[in-house]
From Swiss-Prot:
Coiled coil: none annotated. SUPFAM superfamilies: Class II aaRS and biotin synthetases, GAD domain-like, Nucleic acid-binding proteins. GO terms for biological process: aspartyl-tRNA aminoacylation. Homodimer. NCBIfam families: aspS_bact, PRK00476.1. This is Aspartate--tRNA(Asp/Asn) ligase. The keyword Aminoacyl-tRNA synthetase applies. Aspartyl-tRNA synthetase with relaxed tRNA specificity since it is able to aspartylate not only its cognate tRNA(Asp) but also tRNA(Asn). Reaction proceeds in two steps: L-aspartate is first activated by ATP to form Asp-AMP and then transferred to the acceptor end of tRNA(Asp/Asn). HAMAP family: Asp_tRNA_synth_type1 (MF_00044). Its main location: cytoplasm. The gene is aspS. Belongs to the class-II aminoacyl-tRNA synthetase family. Type 1 subfamily. Residues 199-202 are annotated as: Aspartate. It comes from Gluconobacter oxydans (strain 621H).
Length: 598
């Protein structure tokens, strides 16, 4: 017999009755019933109930065991009858009557319990992550992640993609976030950077003549944590294709994502059927107030600026006259809500930096509310018609200029739909956001700058760069969004040196700057580069959605905390002066802030 196990803890069934077996695992829980001791023994695969009979030498040894101790049990499989069966366990029809028990490793008192579903402080869980990962939900999340990655990889291979690995030690990149820098000992004063993405390498692979590349790529960015963004390190399904249009990229990625979500989505959930909707960026900002629209939310924002222009409602009339916008967020069914509902949303708006949240309630005899007192009846009716509302509905307003009012109206849209319970449940709704602007106006400097990826091909090519207002030029750039979460950015790349130099020139970067910063890729394009494009869906975010977790750290094996610290390994940590000297580095640490005198 094997020294540790003949079966795993999920394997035994009624047909094993009478067999002598050996199991190893962790003591998940113990229960004492009238002299008999029951142990739930857990391993990676499942749980089996162990019975320690009364009047045996094993009982005293088993009673001394702490939960989470590791043991090996040998005994006979017996069938459980009637109410003793546990339908919640695959092994619930049998148990093992122990006749030998060996302690492999005793556990000390736990910092928190593995059994149960209590919420413990995140920092405590991360400090003892190896214990946290024993909890059933966490174990399932990490196994789901592994299966999702396997599925993604297989689906890419089936579409003719080849997996390559790109360098981890590289040069600083233009992705936008701060780099993690690694001092080069053999080259004093110089640094490698950990890649923010394999962007330039995957494009160079296309220049090298490889046609379809992918990898599950680690990416490193020194940026702040969010619920859907892990600080420091994350993984993406990075891919690139030669001789493709934007639609070719969509045709490849849609079945990969739809297939993975169909494979791992809980039963009864709905997924976007057929081709994912394509929404131009301008339309997304107009209709949803976001470039990451959540299509589970049925509300569509409407522009009602003209209804307030030269109207009796002075505040909005003034905003309209000065070039601002008034946006209406429909609230179907909200007309029956008490006054407190509207006051609560008004207070919420103020807490979020707005002056308030105006509204109109529609009844059988017209509109009601503070705005209606100073707004002509025909204008109230016009707003109702534009928004497609009826008696018993309401509408909220956001007013201001440019992107600021667009984004705030999007936040209001989400808040109103949440409060009215309008967001579709148990569904994954995908869309592409396309036609991103190539450039934007930097509000601080007043100069034109790239709005997103500087290596995207401008729509219209060199002619557009030479003849159009830069702020009217769109790029062949796209995002894929699911339930309001951006899963991926991508683009058809700018592979023509003259177009690239002109694109950077418009953004204020001379040819010498481009040559210095991106000379490796630019030179490669001078030796014959195919048209190419790709994308890079975030693996962590995909798993977060499929696991229905609100925080991305719940689907990462050993994540950093919100402050970018590894509490378990105590990183980052100071290093010895001798190591700094070896690297020719000196520290210039910030001075501690003075404490107030008493």
């Amino acid at each position: 017999m094997h020294p540790y196990r003949t079966h795993d803890c999920s394997a035994l069934r009624e047909e094993n009755a009478g067999q002598v077996v050996r199991l190893s695992g962790w003591v998940h829980s113990k229960r004492d019933h009238g002299g008999l001791l029951f142990i739930d023994l857990r391993d990676h695969y499942g749980v089996t109930q162990i019975v320690i009979p009364a009047g045996t030498d094993l009982l005293e040894k088993a009673e001394r065991l702490r939960v989470e101790s590791v043991i090996t049990v040998t005994g006979k499989v017996v069938v459980r009858h009637g109410s003793q069966r546990n339908p919640n366990l695959p092994t619930g029809d049998v148990e093992v009557l122990a006749d030998a028990l060996e302690v492999r490793s005793s556990a000390e008192v736990l910092p928190f319990q593995v059994a149960g579903n209590e919420n413990y402080p995140e920092d405590l869980r991360l400090k003892y992550r190896y214990i946290d990962l024993r909890r059933d939900k966490m174990h399932q999340n990490i196994m789901l992640r592994s299966k999702v990655i396997t599925s993604l990889r297989q689906r890419m291979i089936e579409q003719g993609f080849t997996e390559f690995q790109t360098p981890i030690l590289t040069a600083s990149s233009p992705e936008g976030a701060r780099d993690f820098l690694v001092p080069a000992r053999l080259h004093p004063g110089k640094f490698y950077a950990l890649p923010q993405a394999p962007q330039q390498f995957k494009q160079l692979a296309m220049v090298a003549g490889f046609d379809r590349y992918f990898q599950i790529a680690p990416c490193f960015r020194d940026e702040a944590s969010r619920a859907d963004r892990s600080p420091g390190e994350f993984y993406q399904l990075d891919f690139e294709m030669s001789f493709v249009t934007q639609e070719d990229v969509f045709t490849v990625l849609e079945p990969v994502l739809a297939g993975v979500f169909n494979e791992f989505t809980p039963e009864g959930w709905k997924i976007t059927d057929g081709a994912f909707p394509r929404i131009p960026y301008a339309d997304a900002m107009r209709d949803y107030g976001s470039d990451k629209p959540d299509l589970r939310n049925p509300l569509i924002i409407k522009d009602v600026t003209d209804a307030f222009r030269d109207s009796g409602f002075g505040l909005f009339a003034k905003i309209a006259a000065s070039g601002g916008q008034i946006r209406a967020i429909p609230a179907p069914g909200a007309g029956d809500r008490p006054r407190g509902f509207f006051d609560k949303l008004n207070s919420w708006a103020r807490e979020n930096g707005a002056g308030g949240l105006g509204y109109i309630i529609f009844g059988e005899e017209g509109g009601k509310g503070p705005i209606v007192k100073n707004l002509e009846a025909d204008r109230v009716e016009s707003i109702r018609e534009i928004c497609g509302l009826k008696a018993g509905d309401a509408v909220f307003f956001a007013a201001g200029k440019g992107d600021e009012v667009a984004k705030f109206s999007g936040v209001v849209r989400t808040k109103v739909a949440t409060e009215l319970d309008l967001i579709e449940k148990n569904a994954f709704r995908f869309c592409w956001v396309v036609d991103f602007p190539m450039y934007e106006l930097n509000e601080e400097t007043g100069k034109v700058d790239f709005s997103h990826n500087p290596f995207s091909m401008p729509q219209g090519g060199l002619e557009a760069l030479n003849t159009q207002d830069p702020l009217t030029i769109n790029a062949y750039q796209y995002d894929i969004v699911c339930n309001g979460v951006e899963l991926s950015s991508g683009a058809i790349r700018n592979h023509l040196p003259d177009v690239m130099l002109r694109a950077f020139e418009i953004a204020g970067y001379g040819p010498e700057v481009v040559e210095e910063r991106f000379g490796g890729m630019l030179n490669a394009f001078r030796y014959g580069a195919p048209p190419h494009g790709g994308a890079a869906p975030g693996v962590d975010r995909i798993v977060m959605l499929l696991a229905d977790e609100p925080n991305i750290r719940e689907v990462i094996l050993f994540p950093l905390n919100q402050s970018g610290e590894d509490l378990m390994m105590e990183a980052p940590a100071p290093v010895e002066p001798a190591r700094l000297k070896e690297l020719h580095l000196a520290l210039d640490l910030p001075k501690p802030k003075p404490t107030a005198s008493k």
